[in-house]
Amino acid sequence: MTMKELFAPSDMTVGKPWEKIVAFTIPMLIGNIAQQLYNTVDSIVIGKYVGDNALAAVGSASPILNLLLVLFVGISVGAGVMVSQYFGARQRKELSMTIGNCVTLTAISSIIIMILGAVLSRPLLEMLKTPDSIIDWCTSYLVILMVGCAGSAYYNILCGILRGLGDSISALIYLLVATVINIVLDIVFVSQFHMGVAGVAYATVIAQAISAVLCMWRLMRMIFDFRPKYLKMKKQYSMEIIRLGLPSGITQAIFSMAMVIVQSLTNSFGEMVIAANVIIMRVDGFAMMPNFSFGTAMTTYAGQNVGARRMDRVEQGAKQGTLIAVGTSTTITLLIVIFGHHLMGIFTNTTELVTLSANMMKILAVGYIAMAITQSLSGVMRGAGDTMTPMWISMVVTVVIRVPLAYGLAFLTRTPELPNGRYQVLWISMLVSWCMGALLTLIFYKKGNWKKKALTGSSSEK
């Protein structure tokens, strides 16, 4: 294979479905793992060089960070679905208009998020009853990342466009470059310049900005130019991006709000449980990467084949891709159960914290198999243009199941010795919600209403 062939967009409407899905997933999985290294390296450097309280500060800020970035999630998903379907349908003009409108929408959204982040970070942390011992660190970390959010926004959205075109290799390479920069800057800013959590935040902002520039350069060489006619907002494209992306943005917002609410419960258990939750979520980020990668691959695969009117091929790929994802997550579950203690020891030298984290991680382990089903089949539905069904499923499992279950179990397990209840309920509620999400996703996939949502042919600009 020549370099030109390696970096060419992948046509997923031909060839064996499982081979196309796996070939697309592998570089994306490596890229997602590298992206998770951003947060993991932050945690390791903070935990080793600053201390457990600083580690807890970064963890307490994360749910709010995710909540404020949901606009970008929506734009990314909406653009990715449109790009994959227009690419599959060979509609070049519509493809360029979609990308241009996406670039402009991202610029507007970045300005909004910068302002909201700078103004709301401290009040939100206070509302969540963040301990006084870590609130200043939390605020510093959040404000820096919010003010510098444009790089992160453009990187994630432009990567989504590249993947919609079938190019997961470029996204991988640019992310690896940024990850190396992030790791180096983390170590320099924290261990050499003693900048604490602020140093970690600055390192992340710089690295993601470099990634965004590289992605933009790739798109310019590949398919897109910056002539004003493409960057000018056009209602039919911008509204379609919002229509398709809004449900995913709402889904992420609901999940992030739930995380914020559950973080308030987590904070009530003290710094040790907060720090344990940070470590668990870092390991969880890696464990979930194959599921997210398969889900994104299935979105691109389904989008291109729906655009090409190959629904039989969509269903064939959905079955094969989901089975591979389930097998991968089963392996991960076994590794967590066997080696969980060693994994937690990477993040901290505190024996009690390692033991606590490892025991709680075992509660979650089997849930990754359920999430393999949810992510793969939700990806198929999104790729076909049905972004509403995954949103409603997420709302039910998060708002109706996870949050009430966490608080309800905490209340029911209160004793004079444990006035806030048992901390284990934090992860038990998550496991139950994951399993219910898989069941609901499977039911709605089988119903098949998602097959009627194709975009191509309805929004062409002749």
Language-model regions: role of each:
Residues 1-25, 83-148, 192-246, 302-367, ...:
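Short alpha-helical transmembrane segments in multi-pass integral membrane proteins
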Residues 12-50, 63-78, 82, 107-114, ...:
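N-terminal transmembrane alpha-helices
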Residues 23-42, 144, 178, 207-211, ...:
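Transmembrane helical elements of multi-pass membrane transporters/channels
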Residues 33, 37-56, 125-132, 188-195, ...:
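Helix-terminus/linker motif at the lipid-water interface of multi-pass membrane proteins
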Residues 46-66, 132-137, 197-198, 240-244, ...:
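Interfacial/gating helices of multi-pass transporter permease domains
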Residues 55-115, 152-171, 263, 276-340, ...:
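Small-residue-rich hydrophobic transmembrane alpha-helices
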Residues 67-70, 182-186, 211-216, 286-289, ...:
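Hydrophobic transmembrane alpha-helices of multi-pass small-molecule transporters
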Residues 76, 144-163, 171-179, 200-215, ...:
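Short runs within selected transmembrane alpha-helices of multi-pass transporters and secretion channels
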